[in-house]
Amino acid sequence: MQPQYYIGIMSGTSMDGADAVLIQMQGKQWQRAVAHSFLPYSDGLRQELLTLQDIGENELHRSNILAQTLSRLYAQTVQQLLAEQNLSAKDIAAIGCHGQTIRHAPEHGYSIQLVNLSLLAELTGIFTVGDFRSRDLACNGQGAPLVPAFHEALFRDANETRAVLNIGGISNISILPPDSPSFGFDTGPGNMLMDAWMQHIWQQPYDKNGEKAAQGKVLPDLLASLLDHPYFSRPYPKSTGRELFSLSWLQGRLKGDEKPEDVMRTLVFYTAQTIFDATKQAAPAIHHLYICGGGIRNPVLIHDLETLFSPDTKLHSTAKLHLDPQWVEAAAFAWLAACWCNQVPSNPHHATGAHSHRILGSGHYGN
């Protein structure tokens, strides 16, 4: 059997742009991640997506127009990746596209990711798989997180308990014991509140290198208020999003006289503390924690995590396991597309709470 190429496209809750990753599979077996491409969202597109997080007027029309806009951007990302690798559409077995989450409401049985999969298939000429969360939700799952099955397939070790931590807008953890089922859940905010505060105060998309946080100090009263959220006492499986952790929620916990840098420093430690608390509660004895996602580029956050987890758990980038930390989530959706094409169940039901394994996604033929 010849190796096959798949492309995964991911737009996370940070809403900064679209990542595309090209992977190589041998039938059902992972071989390697080959290449990555990224296209940023314009400020206008990001703002339009953010407004759809809240109930507003004419949502159906606005969401469908944005789904088409996103699909055209996704197609450009694919075409850019193909050109860089001297490949054509006929070289790709399938695309796996997550879309852009605008609402996640598992308690009501739905999760909405904006993308027009038929348009994406038409524009690229490549068979396209998407709508991965709906089938898990249909069998009483949370529809999230979906990446623990991918983490298990690539990173599980027969001799030690590992964990994989993705720090995107939301943080999620996959626990990979050597001799029992893997599981995972959303620990809470990742970069989401930090980014929202940065945009609100300094009109910048994120705190580059944690520079603003490094100028501040942790505010104990604010930290205690933020930690006093019912999400953290809920048992897993569980998942969350902007619906619970928004800028307005944060502002409701401020007195108004805090230094902006102190708020930022507190938000960084808050993310680290909630990750640590959730991980230790779920799996007290983790030997190695592998980190991916945009949060790995914040040295203040990584320092806080290393301080909290030391000396029992060693922290590493997923690069140590031969996968770039910025590529992991998009690679996961390429892998999910390969699972669909090979009829392999791929929902991590121990993580989502679904009552059984299911093949995730729906397929759309290219032109």
Can you say where each PLM-predicted feature lies in the sequence?
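Conserved ATP-utilizing enzyme core subdomain
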Residues: 2, 17-31, 36-41, 183-272, ...
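Phosphate-binding/catalytic loop of phosphoryl-transfer enzymes
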Residues: 2-9, 106-111, 122, 126-205, ...
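N-terminal beta1-alpha1 ligand-phosphate binding loop
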Residues: 6-24, 296
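Glycine-rich phosphate-binding/hydrolytic loop that grips phosphoryl groups
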Residues: 11, 15, 269, 319-366
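Short beta-strand-loop/turn "lid" adjacent to the catalytic site in phosphate-handling enzymes
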Residues: 56-117
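Phosphate/ATP-binding catalytic cores across multiple sugar-kinase/actin-like superfamilies
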Residues: 73-81, 260-285
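Non-transmembrane, aqueous-exposed alpha-helical and coiled segments at domain scale
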Residues: 89, 259, 263-267, 278-282, ...
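Glycine-rich phosphate-binding loops at beta-strand->alpha-helix junctions
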Residues: 102, 286-308
